[in-house]
Amino acid sequence: MFTLAHLSDLHLALTPKPSELASKRGLGYINWQRKRKHIHRPDVLAAITRDLQARSAQHIAVTGDLTNFSLPGEYAWARRWLESIGQPTDVTVIPGNHDVYVRGAEKLPAKFWSDYIRGDDGLERFPFVRRRAEVALIALSTGVPTGPFMATGRLGERQLARLAEALEQTRGSFRTVLIHHPPLSPARRFFRRLIDGADLRRVLVEKGAELLLHGHDHRRSLVWLEGNGTRKIPAVGVPSASAYAKYAKEDPAGYNIFRIEGSSGNWRCETVSYQRGGDGAISECARYRLY
């Protein structure tokens, strides 16, 4: 059995310098001061981290938005947090839209997290593939700079083509796709959607996958996507790992543990969700079989 932990959307935030407020960060900082700083709290993340570590998962996937304004100081803070939860070989990271908040931030993930965003082939490009026991982790990046009031993501043709190749090359493994933006968003979330989500879904229909993990929505969710053949693909979302229950608009902080075993055509996968309640206690809140 292989145990995989999934958490997302830490939103580690520092105060931008005055010179940095002329960009999109200025509007983001106003929003942070008005409400988001009350939601995303380091003490909540610390509690979630301690609880997660006690579960002794074999691998941890972090699906983006580790930072809030994509400041170098936030990246360094996130790096220290990553080092606290595991070795780079045991932790896989992808960026989210907040990690590429403004132009110029695209280079920061490789600068600060290079050994956490590198595949088994040693190359720093997306998607990258990490094989761990019977699981093949296929990591994508949807983080692109966007204008004010936008939180969209994009994969692009090159990344989609490489994804198709990776899914084909890892056929027979428990292929787990890591992505920040969900592959399917309701119309009301137009400004937060994955722009080429339909293209991603077409690749998944053509090549198949066993599991897709995402963040972005700050909600615990499960959506079944069309896959290759008769079996559908579970797309599982997770809440923000730092969301304080009292002020969270969506679900309070939590994470998931996946227990995976079996072989191609005979997989078994159980998901257990943990959540930090209003009283500060972290407990199991859901358990279900995907396979």
What are these model-derived regions, one by one?
Residues R189-S264:
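Conserved beta-sheet core of the metallophosphoesterase superfamily
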Residues H11-L14, N68-L71, N97-A105, P145-F149, ...:
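Active-site environment of divalent metal-dependent phosphoester hydrolases
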Residues M1-Y75, E83:
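N-terminal active-site segment of His-dependent metallophosphoesterases
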Residues T170-P186:
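Short acidic, glycine-rich surface-loop motifs adjacent to enzyme active sites
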